[in-house]
Amino acid sequence: MANIYYENHADLARLAGRTIAVIGFGSQGHAHALNLKESGCDVIVGLYQGSKSWSKAEGLGLKVLPVAEAAKEAQIVMLALPDTAQAAIYRDAIGPHMTPGKTLMFAHGFNIRFGQIVPPEGVDVSMVAPKAPGHRVREVYTQGGGVPALVAVHQDASGNALADALAYARGLGCTRAGVIETTFAEETETDLFGEQVVLCGGVSALVKAAFETLVEAGYQPEVAYFECMHELKLIVDLFYQGGLNYMRYSVSDTAEWGDYTAGPKIITDETRATMKRILADIQSGAFAEDWIEENHNGRPRFNAYRTRDIAHPIEQVGRELRRMMPFVNPREVVPGEGGA
């Protein structure tokens, strides 16, 4: 069983007298900076000159500095940046200031696991990864709670890397819920696998294939959208609250019977073998190598995939149907806009 740490395992006083630089002010960065500040920590935010987030962070009472200055001033540096941006920013602005005795922290292990960032000896390297989007990390903290998190140590130069990481997690509010000890490799590999096989790749492909099957069989696209896309949230919410058993308790007996009889026909031995190959590509670094090369080349395939899927009929039908349902708080992505 995993080691799980709570409030009594974490001493926030370990952060006293130390400045924490949160590099980035996006989804995770803003939550980290504000939660730590309200937990009594000395926090600065590191941003590039001209960042749209600069005035926003200052407006929330945070001290903002250029990235290099923030890294120089701080004793603890948290990289709360997109994976693809971290290596260059670390090389140019952060690495030169990672002197012995400092701590370099991550909210995701990609760049350490795949060797894109190699910290110097004498520096603690750890990770605190809240298991929720930044807005949720912030919201739950302000309500007096916390979201679970993962904690890991890659390099323990001081002998106190885990204790300091747990103190940081307490500053975020995560020890109120529980912090699970892991490794950079486990966090990174399972995170990528979950995204590819279930949360993004698997679900997206399943929804599109089911929608296409119904439409090709002559059913109306609008009805197919409701059955294959819209109602998915109803089921996922049940998973979220009580797992598979609660979902089956909540749906009709007919739906439950279909679950048992049809599900194994969708997830076949061949599908499981494919999952294992995907995991092997993640573990070997093949996926990371491909993704890093894609970014170096200007993302031609990535952009082509995005353009292709924006034009899928399920997106066109969904856009129209969501206008009928303002209560779902519809969102529309403008072509060319990026995500995280």
Curated annotation (Swiss-Prot):
Biological pathway: Amino-acid biosynthesis; L-isoleucine biosynthesis; L-isoleucine from 2-oxobutanoate: step 2/4; Amino-acid biosynthesis; L-valine biosynthesis; L-valine from pyruvate: step 2/4
Domain KARI C-terminal knotted span(s) in chain numbering: 183-328
Needed co-factor(s): Mg(2+)
GO molecular function, one term: ketol-acid reductoisomerase activity
PROSITE patterns: KARI_C (PS51851), KARI_N (PS51850)
Residues given in the record as Mg(2+) 2 binding sites: D191, E227, E231
Binding positions (Mg(2+) 1): D191, E195
GO biological process terms on file: isoleucine biosynthetic process; L-valine biosynthetic process
InterPro entries referenced in this protein's UniProt entry, alphabetically: 6-PGluconate_DH-like_C_sf (IPR008927), KARI (IPR013023), KARI_C (IPR000506), KARI_N (IPR013116), KARI_prok (IPR014359), NAD(P)-bd_dom_sf (IPR036291)
Active site: residue positions: H108
Role of this protein: Involved in the biosynthesis of branched-chain amino acids (BCAA). Catalyzes an alkyl-migration followed by a ketol-acid reduction of (S)-2-acetolactate (S2AL) to yield (R)-2,3-dihydroxy-isovalerate. In the isomerase reaction, S2AL is rearranged via a Mg-dependent methyl migration to produce 3-hydroxy-3-methyl-2-ketobutyrate (HMKB). In the reductase reaction, this 2-ketoacid undergoes a metal-dependent reduction by NADPH to yield (R)-2,3-dihydroxy-isovalerate.
Protein name: Ketol-acid reductoisomerase (NADP(+))
Record gene name: ilvC
